[in-house]
Every structure is written in structure tokens, then in C-alpha cells.
């Protein structure tokens, strides 16, 4: 039944792509034509993937790279308190590819543009925030990604760095998240609490009691369980949504370049 749904939705999305290509192809505008070429490259890249991709996104210093290090146990990944990721890097983990993206919400536009492009291309997104929660800037960026750009169907939220505060504050963290994601629920985004650094610290520990305590505090096993279930439940949806995300992104960019009312009318009738 799931496969039948996939075929049905895939055909509908293919028709949307064809309609989009036809409309853009009829516009005499060099910048629009250049954007159409970029768009086609992204569509080809997305359709030609042979691995399932999960992108880790969020503010800088939220611990995205640390989380990927904990999952892969690849100690060559650069981690730290400051901006350490300035490019997109892929890491193999089990049967999927984990994508480490630059932090958003900085004054480095090229970092944000790079992260947003891979949000479109990735099959699923893990949005990482810390126990400090959503300030106005982080909340604005999250809502833009999840709701304005329609990426919520392929997103989950992970709260990292739980060791910085008492777990007694978990209810407060959850209430903070609820305000931002409303009317969606914590369950919709599979909100998970972890401390990736504690897991890495456990790997250096020879005392079994301390090692186990750090592993429990990290909750990495809980995160992996949620992530696996997330892939099983949302994987097909995420792959379909990626094409729509790409179309939506280029639709906005091309609309900004269109100069005639007639061409704008064509696009509005499409969307």
C-alpha cells in the first residue's frame, strides 16, 4: 500500500515539475534561464541519489558536528564552541548519509545559502537546538524553514547539550518548544533530548561505572531509536517533499527576476 501511495504522489510531483519547466521555459529572461539550469541540476542530483540523506541543520555551535561524531565515532570531524563548519560534508553511517551543514543565523550569507540548498536536497532534516531554547532569531529561522518553506513533514527536532542544565528543566524546555511549533506537537517533530558530548566523553572513560553513567546521560541510544523510526515512517515522504522544496525555492528566486506582469501571472496560476 505504501508503494502504491509513493507511485501516485511521485506521478503528481512529476506533473508539477513538467508544468514548472514549461512555464519557466517560456520566459525570455537570461537570469531566469540561468536559474532554470541551476534548478534542473538540483532536480537531476536529487533524483540520481543512491543513498538516503539526513541533513543536520540549525544555529552554529548547537552541536551538529558533535552529534555526527557521536553517531559515526569519527574523531577526525572538527568540533568546538565557535563556528567550525564552513562547508557541507557528508559522512556514511550505517545505510544512510549524514550531512553536516554550516550554522544558520550568522552574518555569513554564504553559509546560510549553502545550508538552505541542502535542506531542499536532503531526504530528512534533523534540526538541532540547545537547552537555551529558541530566542527570537532562532524561532524566526525555524518557522521559516518548517512552515514557510514547508519542510516540517521531513523534520525532527533534537535538543542537545542537556548536561549544561538539570534534567528537571525538561518540562520548561518542552514548553519553550511548544510555543514555537504550535499548532504542531512535540510528537509531530519527534522532539528528542541528548548530550552528544557525554557520549564522546564516555569513549575515553576506563571506569565502567562512569562510562555507563555518561552513556545514559547522553541518551544517544534513544536518539538513534527515534532516528531509525523517523527514517522508516517519513523516509518516502521526505524524498517526495524534497522535489517540492526545490521547486518552491526556485519559484521564489525566479519570481524575483521576472519583470513583466504577464510572466508573473503565469507563475501565480501555476502555484
Residue ranges and their predicted role:
Residues 56, 127, 157-159, 193, ...:
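Structural beta-sheet core signal
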Residues 1-101:
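Conserved G1/Walker A P-loop phosphate-binding module
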Residues 207-218, 231-270:
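C-terminal helical "lid" subdomain and adjoining coupling/linker elements of P-loop NTPases
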Residues 12, 16-19, 23-26, 74, ...:
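Conserved, well-folded catalytic cores of nucleic-acid-processing
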Residues 75-78, 101-107, 132-135:
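Short, flexible loop segments at the rims of nucleotide/cofactor-binding pockets, characterized by
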Residues 163-235:
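Canonical P-loop GTPase G-domain recognition
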Residues 86-90, 110-117:
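Conserved alpha-helical scaffold flanking the Walker A/P-loop in AAA+ ATPase domains
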Residues 95, 113-189:
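Conserved C-terminal guanine-recognition region of P-loop GTPase G domains, centered on the G4
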Amino acid at each position: 500500500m505504501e508503494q502504491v501511495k509513493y507511485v501516485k504522489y511521485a506521478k503528481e510531483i512529476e506533473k508539477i515539475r513538467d508544468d514548472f519547466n514549461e512555464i519557466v521555459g517560456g520566459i525570455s529572461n537570461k537570469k531566469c534561464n540561468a536559474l532554470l539550469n541551476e534548478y534542473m541540476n538540483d532536480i537531476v542530483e536529487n533524483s540520481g541519489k543512491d543513498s538516503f540523506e539526513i541533513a543536520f541543520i540549525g544555529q552554529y555551535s548547537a552541536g551538529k558536528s558533535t552529534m555526527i561524531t557521536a553517531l559515526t565515532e569519527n574523531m577526525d570531524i572538527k568540533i568546538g564552541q565557535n563556528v567550525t563548519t564552513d562547508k557541507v560534508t557528508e559522512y556514511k553511517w550505517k545505510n544512510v548519509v549524514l550531512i553536516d551543514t554550516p550554522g544558520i543565523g550568522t552574518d555569513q550569507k554564504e553559509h546560510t545559502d549553502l545550508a538552505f540548498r541542502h535542506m531542499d536536497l536532503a531526504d530528512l532534516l534533523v534540526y538541532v537546538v540547545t537547552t537555551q531554547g529558541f530566542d527570537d532569531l532562532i524561532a524566526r529561522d525555524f518557522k521559516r524553514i518548517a512552515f514557510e518553506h514547508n519542510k516540517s513533514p521531513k523534520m525532527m527536532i533534537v535538543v542537545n547539550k542537556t548536561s549544561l542544565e538539570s534534567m528537571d528543566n525538561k518540562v520548561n524546555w518542552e514548553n519553550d518548544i511548544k510555543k514555537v511549533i504550535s499548532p504542531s506537537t512535540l510528537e509531530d517533530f519527534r522532539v528528542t533530548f541528548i548530550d552528544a558530548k557525554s557520549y564522546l566523553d564516555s569513549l575515553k572513560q576506563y571506569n565502567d561505572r562512569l562510562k555507563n553513567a555518561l552513556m545514559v546521560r547522553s541518551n544517544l541510544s534513544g536518539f538513534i531509536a527515534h532516528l531509525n523510526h523517523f527514517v522508516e515512517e517519513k523516509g518516502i515522504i521526505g524524498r517526495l517533499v524534497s522535489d517540492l522544496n526545490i521547486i518552491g525555492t526556485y519559484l521564489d528566486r525566479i519570481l524575483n527576476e521576472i519583470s513583466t506582469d504577464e510572466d508573473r501571472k503565469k507563475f501565480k496560476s501555476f502555484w
